[in-house]
């Protein structure tokens, strides 16, 4: 069954490769000022995190009842994702923030499992149509390395996020500019300020999309 599942996803994404190349790489959906915000926290052990935990705390304080944070490490310590519960959470969200540390140039295993299980369930039941049409995906990433490490001639953060971007674009979601911070390690004496500035960038990005939508410019 696992082999079939993986093969199915690969074939689906390959089949849409031509379609992807012609699609815009920015959000082109409509989001109102009342759009709900769903945060999927993909850190495998948030209690030991400083940057990710601080960012989530600021988001919760700022948005209050408008935001819902799902801590995958608390909900699924055994990696057994409750797909129906996750799809219910997705249903009313206008913005979906994927909050995670960059591990080996990708998402942590728990977040990858969430993506695989939740999206595959839509595919196998042929129930994907329209589910992500009016949703913006924001990759909010903390990075342990320095800015120089992810600057030309090296590969950029955006390059490492392409698989994630194309995964969500192929299902019809909007892809907002990612928000990321460097030097997110305990040895960084300015880590609290780094996390706060990351939060500010997230707020600015969300407000920008809401403002444009309210003006009817999309």
Model region roles, listed by residue range:
Residues 1-27:
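Bacterial Sec-dependent N-terminal signal peptides
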Residues 84-165:
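Helix-loop-strand module that forms the ligand-binding subsite of alpha/beta enzymes
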Residues 65-78:
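A short beta-strand-loop structural module common to alpha/beta enzyme folds
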Residues 27-65, 181:
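N-terminal beta1-alpha1 ligand-phosphate binding loop
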Residues 38-40, 70, 97, 138-140, ...:
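Hydrophobic/aromatic beta-strand patches that form the interior of the parallel beta-sheet core
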């Amino acid at each position: 069954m696992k082999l079939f599942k993986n093969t199915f996803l690969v074939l689906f994404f390959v089949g849409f490769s031509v379609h992807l190349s012609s699609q815009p790489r920015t959000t082109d959906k409509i989001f109102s000022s009342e759009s709900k915000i769903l945060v999927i926290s993909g850190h495998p052990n948030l209690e030991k995190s400083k940057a990710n935990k601080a960012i989530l705390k600021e988001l919760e304080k700022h948005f209050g009842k408008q935001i819902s944070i799902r801590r995958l490490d608390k909900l699924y310590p055994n990696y057994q994702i409750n797909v129906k519960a996750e799809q219910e959470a997705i249903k009313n969200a206008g913005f979906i923030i994927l909050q995670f540390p960059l591990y080996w140039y990708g998402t942590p295993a728990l977040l990858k499992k969430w993506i695989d299980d939740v999206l595959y369930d839509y595919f196998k039941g042929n129930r994907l149509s329209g589910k992500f049409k009016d949703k913006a995906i924001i990759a909010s990433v903390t990075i342990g390395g320095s800015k120089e490490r992810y600057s030309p001639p090296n590969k950029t953060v955006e390059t490492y996020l392409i698989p994630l971007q194309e995964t969500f674009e192929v299902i019809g979601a909007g892809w907002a500019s990612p928000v990321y911070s460097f030097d997110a390690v305990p040895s960084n004496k300015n880590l609290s300020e780094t996390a706060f500035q990351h939060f500010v960038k997230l707020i600015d990005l969300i407000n920008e999309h809401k403002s444009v939508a309210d003006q009817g410019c999309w």
